[in-house]
């Protein structure tokens, strides 16, 4: 019996040695993935005028209330300014959603984490994402959600929110699909220093 117990003990010890252990998520290092995308920032920037037209047009600046029978009309909305820091975030996020179409980033966390990585100060923030629309006007029409009920107008409410004073927009073409991102925010200091629109094809590290 003593020998049997010893054999069993050795078996269990051996089993404990070879059993795989689950690693904690915060112990796993994200492995960067490099993808080649084609940016389309010249066209992406044209969406700013479309947003501001909706914000300042009394016929367009509305959204459904939760009862889906009455509307909230957004009066006296100011035009959004284009923020080139937010554009940088939107471009990064556009590449990320090409890998994982979600507001959660491929490496975990959310879009707002990118703001911190880019040292962007902000108050309120919101994000719209879209895929497959080939032109700026098409994606803007989808985000407007004119014919959707309250539950389907989240993108529209971002576009018409009085909490935001600026926006940056990103557009990439990857693996045959167009991806679009709008980053809205309230910023005490908006970066309006224009940079050349990036319409190049380049390798992007998503990490």
What are the residue ranges of the model-derived segments?
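A well-ordered secondary-structure block
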Residues: 92-96, 103-188
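Short, compositionally biased P/S/T/A/G/V-rich stretches that sit at domain boundaries
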Residues: 186-206
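Short, well-ordered surface patches within globular domains
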Residues: 26-118, 156, 162-167
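Sec-dependent signal peptide cleavage junction
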Residues: 17-27
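Bacterial N-terminal signal peptides that target proteins for export
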Residues: 1-8
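Hydrophobic core
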Residues: 12-17, 55
């Amino acid at each position: 019996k003593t020998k049997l117990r010893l054999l069993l003990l050795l078996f269990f010890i051996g089993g404990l040695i070879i059993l795989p252990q689950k690693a904690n998520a915060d112990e796993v290092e994200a492995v960067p993935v490099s993808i080649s995308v084609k940016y389309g920032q010249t066209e992406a920037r044209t969406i700013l005028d479309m947003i501001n037209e909706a914000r300042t047009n009394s016929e367009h600046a509305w959204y459904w209330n939760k009862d889906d029978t009455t509307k909230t009309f957004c009066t006296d909305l100011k035009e959004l300014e284009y923020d080139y820091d937010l554009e940088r975030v939107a471009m990064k996020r556009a590449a990320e959603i090409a890998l994982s179409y979600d507001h959660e980033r491929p490496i975990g966390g959310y879009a707002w984490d990118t703001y911190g990585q880019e040292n962007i100060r902000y108050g309120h923030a919101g994000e719209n994402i879209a895929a497959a629309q080939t032109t700026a006007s098409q994606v803007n029409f989808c985000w407007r959600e004119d014919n959707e009920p309250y539950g389907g107008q989240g993108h529209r409410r971002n576009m018409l929110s009085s909490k935001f004073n600026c926006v940056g927009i990103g557009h990439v073409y990857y693996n045959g699909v167009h991806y679009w991102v709008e980053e809205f925010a309230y910023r005490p200091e908006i970066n309006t220093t224009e940079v050349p629109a990036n319409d190049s094809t380049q390798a992007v590290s998503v990490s």
